[in-house]
Amino acid sequence: MLDTIALDLVPSDHQVHVALFRGVQNAGFLHSQLLARNAAFEYAFVDASVVASRNQILAAAFRALAVKLSDNLRTPNVHSELVTSLSPSNNIADAYRRFGISPATKDLVVVKITYPSDSAATPVSRDDIEKHLAENVHGTPAGFSDDELAVSTDWTKVKKYYKLNGLPWLDAIKDEQERKLQMDELVLGAMALRGV
């Protein structure tokens, strides 16, 4: 299941393709392809355990695209920029370690950002992306929705990485759904304020 999303405020030929996989059996292989900079595996592979919501991924994709469009990438490509955009700090290595794929990753969010470039006037198609993922990600596809992501979210990690521990007002919220909504908003705020 691959969702294709056109973000507001970016050119219409720049698209974001997102898939969620559960029970990934070959995370080590996928991780090694990223480390080898294999162009066929130029995706943002995000450990789903640190994803609080769809908005978190889409905000990171928007930021990565904005940086790409302004020619200010700090990382090798727009996909690695997306992974670092998830982090509340500017430490690139820390962002890769916390938010990117590792050999131990079980649930995986895969993002492919497509746009015309000097080397390819026509970006890779949605069907080609879906086929490549089906052949190379050994996991069970799931829908890219907040409900599906919630199954994978490790709130202990999210709270630690975004420094949400020890907030008495947050801990005092009795309604679990409301508490998660507030944490999601705090995560988005931390991402937006990075580097300010």
What role is predicted for each listed range?
Residues 96-196:
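Glycine-rich, aromatic-bearing surface loops/beta-hairpins
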